[in-house]
Amino acid sequence: MAQAGTTDLTPSIRWILAGLSLSMLLSSIGTSIANVSLPTLAQAFDASFQQVQWVVIAYLVTITTVIVSVGRLGDMTGRRRLLLVGVFLFTVASVLCGVAPTLWLLIAARAAQGLGAAIMMALTMAFVGETVPKSQVGSAMGLLGTMSAIGTALGPSLGGMLISEFSWR
């Protein structure tokens, strides 16, 4: 039963919120999943630790430099279209990360993945404001914040599991 002054979320809004939560989770996992793989990558590519650190740095620098302008770009081109582009870019870049034959291609793929993640993070938050009833925006933002924290915390464990079970690819 809904409390006075609140609105229940319709099933379609719940599905939208689930999709937005997944978008936030995936982009947040990307921030920390590669950290534990750096020693393995240094060995696989016969590279120094300073060189393989760029796998993490490329992702984070791209997110931090692009995320602010994504909101305005979404206003100009359409948020839904741009979010789908971000998800597509993130997915393709993730595949490229898995098959990269050189360290430099892996770094470039991580930068592209960071671009997709920046789009996903920024527009996920924007969609909450236009999709969820005003009385539920705080709860929805809390859910997205929780998904971001879970993704960031889950990244190293997931990365370690993937490295130990399947190698870095």
How would you name each of these model-derived features?
Residues 2-169:
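Transmembrane-helix bundle of Major Facilitator Superfamily
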